[in-house]
Amino acid sequence: MKTIVRRTALAVCILVLALILPTAASAACAGFDDVPESADCYESVIYLAECEIADGTGNDCFSPEQLITVEQWAVMLCRAYGVETIGDSWQDVGRSGVVEAYRQGWLNETAFSAPCSPMCRSVLVESAFAAADVPVYDSTLYEGGTSLSTADNILRVGRELGLCSDDADANALVTRGEAAIILHAVLTQSFRIE
C-alpha cells in the first residue's frame, strides 16, 4: 500500500514539474510586452535581460522609447562588467552604480550632479568605450583628418564601428532601446581601431 502511494505521489510530482518547467522557461525568455520581435532593439534587449544586465521598468515593460538616465546606464555597465552595486531600493542601487561607474572611469564627475538626467549620445558612447577599453584617437592623427570636438571624435569612432548612424547627433538624447543596442554591440563584438 505504501509503495502505491509513493509511486502515485512521485508520478504526480513528475507531472506537475513537467507542466511547470516549460512554462517557467518560456516566461523567462518571453521578453517584454513593449518590445516586439520586429523592434530594432529586440535582440539587444533580450540579450541584456537574459544576462541579467538590464531589467524592465515594471509590468513586463522595458520602455525602449523612454530616455535612459545616468543611473540606469551606470547600473547596466556595472552589471555587464561584474562590478557590484549595493542597495535595497532602486534609488540606492542607482546611486551605487553611479559611484562605481565613476570609480571605474566609465563616467565623469558630472554624473554625480545629475544622476536622474537623460544622457546624450556622445556621453553614452564615450562611457561605453571607456568600459570596453576602446580607445578614441583624435581625428587629426589620421591622414586628411580635420580637428573635431571631443564629442564629434567619439561619434566619428562610433560611426566607424557601426554603433552610430552617419547622421547621428552628438547631443541627441538616447533612449533605453538605443542604449541596449549600443551596450549589446560593445559586449558581443570585437573592435579594431586603425
Which residues does each PLM region occupy?
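Feature responds to low-complexity, polar/acidic, surface-exposed segments characteristic
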Residues: 3, 14-40, 55-174, 187-194
